[in-house]
């Protein structure tokens, strides 16, 4: 009974089984995906490109020549835009940054270009007869830097050629001791020559040349972008989670200095130390301070310049007279601020090197530019001794809490002949600057090196000031930037396949996307970012156009120059590069048949070997950057398939156009074709009538020639009667039957009407026959089709019934088996339960039997 009840309960479930089978068949069917092209996606790749400069037009004095040539830069944007890229992580590496190399090359080129038109110092490469000049040094005190050392300034006389080359004249000038060297073969110690005369070409800086640093903004051309890391404790190497995109960097002052970094940017929170490899003592350590330390430098004595003419257009400027006290140049730094800064730096170094004692010492030796802190102050090159700055020891218990106005005075020396830092074999002569010189700068960073080769178990680490490689100066400002190339073309799988259909253009519904930057949707999913394609594509083109206008204005502003500066050349390169990139993208879109489209479907099937992720995971969980990295190895293959597909499609369209008139029968019924049909009909009828007239005339002419006069066209010719129908009646009685006659043509209109009537009747009969035939064929086809449908319907009913019966039988058998098994299981469980329940009874019976 239980099995029968189960069978009855499961008999009604065959419908559910059928539905489940259908669902499985639908789900198992593979869904075709097709490649879709998107233009304007927020994707970028690391790149190396030509950067151009932007600078404030009012940042320099127009009366002097600015060595940085910022007048050739484009104006800075008054409202610079910085778009934060949410949910984006990017790798940065300040030690392998092409922006640093590019800035270094630019500064070298600017220095070289500023010296090209200047006078060479070859006439001064002669024997100098020099004596020591002390002036009134004995009357000075040490309160402001101390007296000048003995032999610090030399009073030299020499012979120099005049405008007439075979004549010489006697001249004199004052030179600093660092700028002259004694001649070895002279024991009088009065013969000297200028330093570097035997190894370098010395060029005098042109009059009114200013070395005052002016902020330079490096900008990326259209089609490129600059990514900026905003992590406050970023080490300069590794991943950055707070990324934004900018078109230009902040204003970077190209300060050429050693040991101390001047007038740079500060850390936002605490002191940051950066190095390519802290364990390698050969690597320079860059220290970025969080609070600047002011350094004030002075050259007290008052110099007067003297002109020495050595030929037409060759004027040498030397120190002709020193007025007032001769005292050293010097720099003052607040002791409290400096020691507080060193304490913070030592704390960071201890954290990096395992809480060891940090010792700062002076430079270990080398060129004067490295041993001393060298920099330019109002046109004079200062070389300051920093021993007082780097002479301290810091351990865990070392702190500096003192405050006050105590200052550290750094003795400085001035050089006029500078060994060019950018390349070997060149030197520069800086003419003396008249008047007293004062300059104030901010120390924003340090360049340090760590001593190596000591005991690894030592508890002390020694650090010394370093410098000389100007790339470290630029690297300290460009550490948070990198250049990327925008790749607006993206491919992804969708369900849409290209169709040639008529469709209306619809506007994008998301107005808020207009305010996003080009890469503002970089952190969004692919589905969310795809709605901003219009904005991004428009910004790409408008950015190119705007940038071209800015570059053209900058180039026009320097047309009066005989030679473009390095900035002008870079602007031209950036202009050409931007247009080339845009045209390349448009060319690819044209090759793929996607010109003017932001979303372009194709007929290329998506291969799961490229990516087997589902559409939901791709469009709702991945960003365009993540997707681009996944299919990067297959991009070139996909591009090739898109091109081949478009070529095949164009070939098919060409073949189709050759059969265009037969493409659609509905075109035969258009009003234009009907008018053409009527015209053809009129021409045919007119031709027939014309032929009829011609043949009638020819027949008449032929009969006239034979001597026959035709009857009138109005005469009715009796028709011939048969032999059984005589024309008369016997005995002449009775009525004559109506005569039959053939009607002749009655004029031209009658002829036209007769032919037209005959043609219409003929056409009517033929069309009627054709319609009857077509109706018969349609009837036969309908009957046969209906029979076929009935046959298939009966077949479907038969197999569905068979499937139903099979499913019912299967379910019944399953139910019976389950029911029988359930009965056995229940019976076994009952027996086990009874046995357990009877255990006490059996025990009692056993005890009773034992007692008996």
Swiss-Prot record:
An example Gene Ontology CC term for this record: viral envelope
Location of region: CD4-binding loop: 363-373
Motif (Di-leucine internalization motif): 851-852
Cytoplasmic side: 702-852
Compositional bias ranges of the Basic and acidic residues kind: 722-739
Keywords: AIDS, Apoptosis, Clathrin-mediated endocytosis of virus by host, Cleavage on pair of basic residues, Coiled coil, Disulfide bond, Fusion of virus membrane with host endosomal membrane, Fusion of virus membrane with host membrane, Glycoprotein, Host cell membrane, Host endosome, Host membrane, Host-virus interaction, Lipoprotein, Membrane, Palmitate, Signal, Transmembrane, Transmembrane helix, Viral attachment to host cell, Viral envelope protein, Viral immunoevasion, Viral penetration into host cytoplasm, Virion, Virus endocytosis by host, Virus entry into host cell
Pfam families linked to this entry: GP120 (PF00516), GP41 (PF00517)
Region (V2) residue spans: 156-197
Entry coiled-coil feature ranges: 629-663
Disordered: annotated segments: 717-739
MF GO annotations: structural molecule activity
Transmembrane feature ranges: 681-701
Lipid-carrying residues in chain (S-palmitoyl cysteine): 760
Gene Ontology BP, a term: viral protein processing
Ranges where the record places region V4: 384-412
Region spans: MPER: 658-679
Modification after translation: Highly glycosylated by host. The high number of glycan on the protein is reffered to as 'glycan shield' because it contributes to hide protein sequence from adaptive immune system. Palmitoylation of the transmembrane protein and of Env polyprotein (prior to its proteolytic cleavage) is essential for their association with host cell membrane lipid rafts. Palmitoylation is therefore required for envelope trafficking to classical lipid rafts, but not for viral replication.
Motif mapping: YXXL motif: 708-711
Known glycosylation sites: 87, 129, 136, 141-142, 155, 159, 189, 198, 242, 263, 277, 290, 296, 332, 339, 355, 385, 391, 397, 401, 405, 442, 457, 607, 612, 621, 633
Signal peptide: 1-31
Region (Immunosuppression): 570-588
Note: Inhibitors targeting HIV-1 viral envelope proteins are used as antiretroviral drugs. Attachment of virions to the cell surface via non-specific interactions and CD4 binding can be blocked by inhibitors that include cyanovirin-N, cyclotriazadisulfonamide analogs, PRO 2000, TNX 355 and PRO 542. In addition, BMS 806 can block CD4-induced conformational changes. Env interactions with the coreceptor molecules can be targeted by CCR5 antagonists including SCH-D, maraviroc (UK 427857) and aplaviroc (GW 873140), and the CXCR4 antagonist AMD 070.
Family: Belongs to the HIV-1 env protein family.
UniProt note: domains: Some of the most genetically diverse regions of the viral genome are present in Env. They are called variable regions 1 through 5 (V1 through V5). Coreceptor usage of gp120 is determined mainly by the primary structure of the third variable region (V3) in the outer domain of gp120. The sequence of V3 determines which coreceptor, CCR5 and/or CXCR4 (corresponding to R5/macrophage, X4/T cell and R5X4/T cell and macrophage tropism), is used to trigger the fusion potential of the Env complex, and hence which cells the virus can infect. Binding to CCR5 involves a region adjacent in addition to V3. The membrane proximal external region (MPER) present in gp41 is a tryptophan-rich region recognized by the antibodies 2F5, Z13, and 4E10. MPER seems to play a role in fusion.
Name of this chain's protein: Envelope glycoprotein gp160
Gene of this entry: env
């Amino acid at each position: 009974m239980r099995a029968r009840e189960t069978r009855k309960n499961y008999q009604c479930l065959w419908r559910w089984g059928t539905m489940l089978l259908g669902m499985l068949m639908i789900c198992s069917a593979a869904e075709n995906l097709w490649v879709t092209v998107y233009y304007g996606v927020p994707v970028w790749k690391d790149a190396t490109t030509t950067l151009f400069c932007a600078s404030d037009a009012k940042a320099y004095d127009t009366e002097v020549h600015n060595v940085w040539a910022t007048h050739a830069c484009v104006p800075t944007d008054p409202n610079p835009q910085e778009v934060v890229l949410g949910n984006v992580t990017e790798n940065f590496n300040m030690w392998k940054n092409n922006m640093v190399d590019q800035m270094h090359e630019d500064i070298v080129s600017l220095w070289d270009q500023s010296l090209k038109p200047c006078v060479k110092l070859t006439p001064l490469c002669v024997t100098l007869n020099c004596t020591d000049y002390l002036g009134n040094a004995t009357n000075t005190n040490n309160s402001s830097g101390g007296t000048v050392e003995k032999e610090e300034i030399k009073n030299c006389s020499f012979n120099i050629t005049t405008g007439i080359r075979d004549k010489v004249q006697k001249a004199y000038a004052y030179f600093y001791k660092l700028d002259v060297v004694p001649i070895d073969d002279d024991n009088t110690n009065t013969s000297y020559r200028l330093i570097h005369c035997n190894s370098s070409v010395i060029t005098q800086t042109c009059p009114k040349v200013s070395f005052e640093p002016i902020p330079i903004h490096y900008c990326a051309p259209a089609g490129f972008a600059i990514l900026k890391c905003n992590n406050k404790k970023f080490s300069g190497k590794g991943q950055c989670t707070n990324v934004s995109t900018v078109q230009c960097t902040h204003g970077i002052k190209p300060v050429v200095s050693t040991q101390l970094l001047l007038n740079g940017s500060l850390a936002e929170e605490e002191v940051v130390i950066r190095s390519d490899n802290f364990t390698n003592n050969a690597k320079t350590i860059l220290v970025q301070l969080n609070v600047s330390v002011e350094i004030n430098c002075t050259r007290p004595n008052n110099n007067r310049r003297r002109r020495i003419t050595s030929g037409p257009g060759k004027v040498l400027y030397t120190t002709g007279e020193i007025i007032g006290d001769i005292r050293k140049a010097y720099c003052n730094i607040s002791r409290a601020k400096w020691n507080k800064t060193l304490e913070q730096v030592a704390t960071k170094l201890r954290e990096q090197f395992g809480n060891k004692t940090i010792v700062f010492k002076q430079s270990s030796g080398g060129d004067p530019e490295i041993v001393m802190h060298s920099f330019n102050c109002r046109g004079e090159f200062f070389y300051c001794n920093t021993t007082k700055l780097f002479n301290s020891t810091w351990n865990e218990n070392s702190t500096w809490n003192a405050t006050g106005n105590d200052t550290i005075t750094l003795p400085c020396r001035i050089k006029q002949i500078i060994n060019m830092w950018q390349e070997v074999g060149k030197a520069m002569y800086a003419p003396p600057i008249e008047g007293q010189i004062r300059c104030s700068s901010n120390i924003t960073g340090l360049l340090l090196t760590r001593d190596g080769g000591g005991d690894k178990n030592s508890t002390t680490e020694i650090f010394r000031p370093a410098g000389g490689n100007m790339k470290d100066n630029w690297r300290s400002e460009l550490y948070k930037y990198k250049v990327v190339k925008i790749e607006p073309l993206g491919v992804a799988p969708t369900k849409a396949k290209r169709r040639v259909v008529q469709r209306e253009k619809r506007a994008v519904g998301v107005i808020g996307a207009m305010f996003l930057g080009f890469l503002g949707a970089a952190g969004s999913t692919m589905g969310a970012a795809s709605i901003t394609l219009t904005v991004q594509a428009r910004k790409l083109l408008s950015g190119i156009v705007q940038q071209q206008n800015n570059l053209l204005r900058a180039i026009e502003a320097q047309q009066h120059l005989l030679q473009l500066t390095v900035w002008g050349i870079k602007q031209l390169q950036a202009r050409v590069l931007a247009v080339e990139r845009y045209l390349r993208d448009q060319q690819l879109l044209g090759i793929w048949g996607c010109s003017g489209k932001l979303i372009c479907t194709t007929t290329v099937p998506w291969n799961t070997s490229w990516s087997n992720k589902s559409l939901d995971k791709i469009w709702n969980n991945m960003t365009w950057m993540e997707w681009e990295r996944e299919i990067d190895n297959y991009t070139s293959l996909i591009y090739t398939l898109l091109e081949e597909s478009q070529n095949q499609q164009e070939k098919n369209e060409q073949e189709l156009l050759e059969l265009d008139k037969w493409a659609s029968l509905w075109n035969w019924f258009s009003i234009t074709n009907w008018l053409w049909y009527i015209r053809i009909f009129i021409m045919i009828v007119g031709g027939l009538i014309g032929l009829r007239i011609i043949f009638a005339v020819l027949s008449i002419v032929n009969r006239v020639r034979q001597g026959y006069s035709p009857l009138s066209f109005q005469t009715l010719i009796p028709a011939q009667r048969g032999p059984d129908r005589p024309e008369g009646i016997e005995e002449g009685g009775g009525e004559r039957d109506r005569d039959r006659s053939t009607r002749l043509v009655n004029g031209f209109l009658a002829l036209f009407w007769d032919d037209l009537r005959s043609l219409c009747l003929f056409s009517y009969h033929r069309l009627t026959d054709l319609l009857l035939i077509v109706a018969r064929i349609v009837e036969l086809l309908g009957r046969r089709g209906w029979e076929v449908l009935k046959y298939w319907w009966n077949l479907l009913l038969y197999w569905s019934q068979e499937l139903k019966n099979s499913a019912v039988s299967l379910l019944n058998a399953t139910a019976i088996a389950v029911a029988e098994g359930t009965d056995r299981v229940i019976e076994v469980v009952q027996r086990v339960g009874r046995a357990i329940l009877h255990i006490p009874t059996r025990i009692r019976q056993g005890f009773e039997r034992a007692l008996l």
